[in-house]
From Swiss-Prot:
Keywords: Disulfide bond, Glycoprotein, Host membrane, Immunoglobulin domain, Membrane, Signal, Transmembrane, Transmembrane helix. The chain crosses the membrane at residues 263-283. This is Putative OX-2 membrane glycoprotein homolog. Disulfide bonds join C42-C126. It comes from Human herpesvirus 6B (strain Z29) (HHV-6 variant B). Residues 147-237 form the Ig-like C2-type domain. It is a single-pass membrane protein. One of its GO terms (molecular function) is cell-cell adhesion mediator activity. PANTHER family: OX-2 MEMBRANE GLYCOPROTEIN (PTHR46841). Glycans are attached at N45, N57, N72, N195.
Length: 292
């Protein structure tokens, strides 16, 4: 290497290092239940010359921290400082915080959102601006809802009528297990709920030869949804019975399902009334026209 290159090498290293901005570290994928408070983490291994930290949902700005003067910050003995907090931006409720940890030369940005429905699953990008250069990383959120399983059975004359209803996200696979056999429908009844979850219902009837043939036998409703399995089981009695799995689930998820069911409850009778009214009107018009 020539003497000139040797003399220029330190200068080149300084120039390169001055413009090198490390890439932020973040979890590439997060999995939470619907109704949870989701925390996105974004960390940059430097605390030098940071001008701003921003979070974007696609191209929409949802959080922005601007650092005016790092020299005026006061740090604790362990080099840890909380600098900024935001609670609302662009009419969106967020909980956004920015931390510096000088001892470990690390800057961390936290963004919390409330995942109220399956439609809140998204990808967020955090962007650090350092020395007028931007560096970004993206974290994607996947939402699930553990199956809520309800098993119901009753007798209709000489038949045991069994219904298994499951609400979850993604849409669950549902089967009924009885007397050592597994029963499933190729096309079950499916209802889409307000929060994005699905309610799947499967029904079967079993003929009994004697009145007490099925009493004391175990019947189960099995549900699977995205690596999650749930079930509700009961011993068949001589009368009507309902059983539900006892796992905790989000209130938001239940609210979404119930609200959708309420809408369904009043819409169907209203449609029937309208149809009957139209038919009565048409019949009346026909009678008048015939008489005239």
């Amino acid at each position: 290497m020539s003497p000139l290159m040797l003399r220029l090498l330190p200068l080149l290293c300084i120039i390169i290092s001055a413009h090198f901005v490390p890439r932020p570290e973040t979890s590439p994928s997060l999995v939470y239940e619907i109704g949870s408070t989701v925390t996105f983490h974004c960390r940059l291994n430097t605390t030098t010359n940071i001008q701003s930290v921003s979070w974007y949902n696609k191209s929409r700005l949802i959080s922005n921290h601007e650092i005016q003067n790092m020299d005026n910050l006061s740090f604790t003995d362990d080099g840890y400082v909380f600098i900024h907090e935001l609670n609302k931006i662009n009419n969106l409720d967020v909980d956004s915080k920015l931390y510096f940890h000088i001892k470990h030369d690390r800057t961390t940005s936290l963004l919390k959102i409330k995942a109220r429905s399956a439609y809140d699953a998204t990808c967020l990008t955090c962007t650090f601006t350092v020395d007028n250069e931007k560096t970004s990383a993206t974290s994607c959120l996947k939402l699930i809802m553990k199956p809520i399983v309800v098993l119901y059975f009753r007798y209709l004359n000489n038949f045991l009528d069994v219904t298994c209803t499951v609400t979850s996200y993604p849409k669950p696979n549902v089967v009924i297990k009885f007397l050592g056999e597994v029963y499933k429908r190729d096309i079950p009844m499916v209802r889409q709920n307000e929060n994005g979850s699905s309610t799947v219902s499967v029904s079967f009837t079993f003929k009994r030869r004697t009145k007490l043939e099925f009493v004391g036998k175990t019947i189960s409703c099995l549900a699977s949804s995205w690596f999650t399995n749930q079930k509700a089981s009961a011993l068949v009695t001589s009368g009507e019975h309902t059983v539900q799995n006892h796992d905790e689930y989000s209130k938001e998820a239940v609210k979404g399902s119930n609200s959708d069911e309420t809408v369904f409850t009043w819409i169907v009778p209203l449609i029937l009334i309208l149809i009957i009214s139209v038919m009565v009107l048409l019949i009346s018009m026909c009678i008048v026209a015939f008489k005239s």
